[in-house]
Regions:
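Family-specific signature for flavin-dependent thymidylate synthase
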Residues: 1-225
Length: 225
């Protein structure tokens, strides 16, 4: 068992197509908990293509696309102006469009991508953050659907089979003084065993044991979680 504090960090995406696809792969692998297979030197095209074929297109929303067009390109501007997942800014001569790769893929607007993709200047900017927290907190956050969210998958992530050293990671509540670290039922580095924290610790140990037990008798990862 591993205990961790909540944390947040930004995933920075560059604006070229290869960067967009790489960013999507990183977000997807965070969901699949396969970040160890993420290779910054390898193209992400095939990974994203296979993800689209599997129907997991929600993660495409993390790929931010910036387009810059002349303000007389009415068809393009009208499309993105009426798209709920895009924003449009105009300074007279030029129009600055912020959208995401899912909009491009589902509407087959690849021509826009090839012709008008640009670095962000006067665009409305989008940001991606990796939030490490417990699932109860994350479910409060994802109620706000104006943003795009990808969570660690209960279906694909399997903590057994010697993956992640057979440890389930739990988040330390803000009200707890439990230190970060790796623990098990035999741990000697547990300073709170005779304190009020002991029930919390014992509950996590039992929870982790039950999770692996259910997997061992044939339950799916989703059922066990």
């Amino acid at each position: 068992m591993i205990l961790k504090h909540q944390s947040i960090k930004q995933y920075v995406q560059k604006h070229m197509l290869s960067d967009i696809l790489k960013h999507i792969e990183l977000c997807a692998r965070t969901s699949y908990k396969s970040e160890d297979k993420f290779d910054t030197n390898k193209s992400s095209s095939l990974f994203v293509e296979n993800m689209i074929k599997s129907g997991h297109t929600s993660v495409l929303e993390h790929g931010t696309v910036y387009l810059t067009v002349l303000s007389d390109r009415k068809e393009i501007i009208n499309f993105y102006s009426t798209n709920p997942y895009s924003t449009v800014m105009n300074d007279g001569l030029l129009t600055y469009i912020t959208t995401n790769y899912r909009v491009i893929e589902e509407n087959k607007r690849y021509g826009d991508l090839m012709s008008y993709m640009s670095a962000p200047t006067k665009h409305i900017k989008r940001f991606t953050f990796l939030i490490t927290t417990d699932r109860g907190t994350s479910h409060e956050i994802v109620r706000h659907r104006s943003m795009s969210f990808t969570q660690e998958s209960t279906r694909y992530c399997n903590y057994s089979n010697n993956r992640f050293n057979n440890n389930v990671t739990y988040i330390i509540p803000e009200w707890s003084n439990v230190p970060e670290g790796k623990y098990n039922i035999y741990s000697s580095n547990v300073p709170w065993l005779n304190t009020t924290e002991s029930c919390f610790y014992d509950g996590l140990i039992d929870n982790e044991s039950d999770y692996f037990g259910l997997l061992n008798i044939g339950w799916t990862t989703e059922q066990a979680r």
